[in-house]
Amino acid sequence: MRFKDQVHFIRRNMKKNRLRVFMTILATTMACAFLVVLSSVGFGIQKTITDMTMSQQIVTKVSVMGKEGDKPIKKADLEKYDHVRSVVERTQVYEPNKATLGNRTNESSNLIFTNMNDELKANMELEKGRVAKSENEIVVGYDFAKRLLTKKESEEYNKKIEEAKGNPEDIKEPKGYTKDILNKTIELSVSKTDSKTGDVTKTKTYDFKIVGITKKPSQDWMEDSNIFISDQFKKDFSEFLDFKGGNVETNIGVFADKFENVEQLTNDLTDDGYYVTSVTTELEGANTFFMVFKIGLIFVGCIAVIISAIGIFNTMTMAVTERTQEIGIMKAIGASPSIIRRMFLMESAYIGILGCVIGIIISYGVSYLVNLAVPMILAATSGGDAGDLNYTFSYIPASLVIIAVVICGGVAVISGMNPARKATKTNVLTALRREL
């Protein structure tokens, strides 16, 4: 019997009992959809956490916090590792400063000294302009201009904060400097304070030209009003502010040449005694947790698939009983037991896979509706905006589809094995005599 004839025989027999086959496929569809949708919640939460982690930092950056035995960290040593594009050392100063542009001032910026050539190698992300090339050029944060306020705007804003009584989020912030700040020259005043009294003891003023603006932060709640100054000024500032105190913080970042090498670079640094953190280390623990979580959800979903397998088993058992004469005739004309077994297993697999395919299609629709409706519901209950909830509540990757097909198809075949084995053991004489 040719394979084409076997398929024709299976389809003809399934059409004889359309209602029973339909109900069996429906049960399989519901079980598969339940498995996929339930598991997609775990995949969705993991995707949300991963995307948030990836968006909040530079993915190729490996932060170096220290070394075993409190040994000094040498920039030259870090540059020798494989796959290193650049090593950036940033020194942040915690002293009062005021940036002035015309009648506007910004007193909420942090001063960061860095090597601009290293920043250029590390592909410093800019919204506008370029990386500073001369010592009197600076790069400012995306929100720097927004913090340039007139004296009147500052006083009104501070007054509203005092009147808000602990609810500053309800206050509308002033727009600040709305024109293009690129290529503008600002006056930067830096003050030295007494460590005991907190009073200002000295003040020094510098003129800087803004040649670059950093990229907009990935999250709406994040703000960047930093001022990046060439480290050529570091010595001058150090003598004035006395960097030996606790008013400075130095951060070292090692940038890999591409994301695929971040994990290897992180492992190499860790093996040599460096205390590091990167995207891969932050996601490692989360991935382990979500792996266990997803396995648990898939296991729960498998219970529904196993229940649907009972329906497939009953359907195939009834099919063998009803086709006793046909089985006897096929055996009488020379059909081997393996062909008969294959035909019933193919029918069982057909029911399982068809139900699985329909279930997956339905799952994608349910997943889309969940991601559309849940943010609206949460926004309505919390009084916020649905657009602010940039979360994925349900996500169906290709791996989940493959898992669902394997589970449903495998369970369907296993459910049909016993009826198929029973069909091969049918006695020819008994089958033909029964019909007479």
Curated annotation (Swiss-Prot):
Lipid-modified sites (S-diacylglycerol cysteine): 32
The keyword Cytoplasm is annotated on this UniProt entry: no
Location of this chain's protein in the cell: Cell membrane
Coiled coil location: 115-165
InterPro entries: ABC3_permease_C, MacB_PCD, Macrolide_Exporter_MacB
Function: Part of the ABC transporter complex YtrBCDEF that plays a role in acetoin utilization during stationary phase and sporulation.
Keyword annotations: Cell membrane, Coiled coil, Lipoprotein, Membrane, Palmitate, Signal, Transmembrane, Transmembrane helix
Induction, per UniProt: Negatively regulated by YtrA.
Family of the protein in this entry: Belongs to the ABC-4 integral membrane protein family.
Organism: Bacillus subtilis (strain 168)
TM region positions: 293-313, 350-370, 396-416
Residue positions bearing lipid (N-palmitoyl cysteine): 32
PROSITE patterns in UniProt: PROKAR_LIPOPROTEIN
GO molecular function: transmembrane transporter activity
Gene Ontology, cellular component aspect: plasma membrane
Assembly behavior: The complex is composed of 2 ATP-binding proteins (YtrB and YtrE), 2 transmembrane proteins (YtrC and YtrD) and a solute-binding protein (YtrF).
Membrane topology note: Lipid-anchor; Multi-pass membrane protein
Protein name (record): ABC transporter permease YtrF
